[in-house]
Amino acid sequence: MKRSLFCICASALLLMSCNVQDNGPLPRGKASAEFTAAMDSYLAAVSDADQDLHSIMVLKDGKVLFEKWMSLGKPDEAHVLNSVSKTFTSTAVGFAVSEGLLSVDDKVISFFPEDLPDEVSGNLEAMTVRHLLTMTCGHETDPTGLAWKTEKDWTKTFLAVPVTRKPGEVYCYNSFGTYMLSAIVQK
């Protein structure tokens, strides 16, 4: 139950954050006392489990029923969503594939000719959208930590990471690959 509620709340927050326009404050609704108590109970359970939840917002009919900012969460700052992004990004790729906008067999480098390193390895050249989706892009370790705090151009940084294994050969959890999928969908 708690996991389901968390997923629902995280999904609502993510969907709301997809619109980058700032149209001012969202309208507010009135939550029932029962709903507010349930949310307070949920947040207490999250805290008791030492989970690092930064923010939560629940909307109904376009109105905010519940909103809380904790830890690193701030209402006026962009927030890294980490693994929540994987579900929505892969869904966006699925829609793009079903609409014929891309194929899972498209080469990753074909989307970013302006961001390629001076020398493109055979493994990087062989990397496809499918490899990003299945986290088998050829990296031996997750390169995500190389970029998100220090680099401005994540696409160039990803493409510059050595692809030491043949794509499709080895699984490596790779959040950076999810970013690349989002960059491909945006193209």
What is the meaning of each model-derived region?
Residues 2-8:
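Sec-dependent signal peptide recognition
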Residues 75, 142-187:
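Catalytic-site signature segments of enzymes, centered on catalytic residues
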Residues 62, 79-105, 132, 181-186:
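Active-site SXXK
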Residues 15-17:
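C-terminal motif of bacterial Sec signal peptides marking the signal peptidase cleavage site
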Residues 80, 99-137, 160, 187:
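Active-site helix/loop module of the DD-peptidase/beta-lactamase fold
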Residues 43-73:
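A short, well-structured edge-of-sheet supersecondary motif
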Residues 32-46:
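Short, basic/aromatic recognition patches
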Residues 19-23:
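Bacterial lipoprotein signal-peptidase II cleavage site
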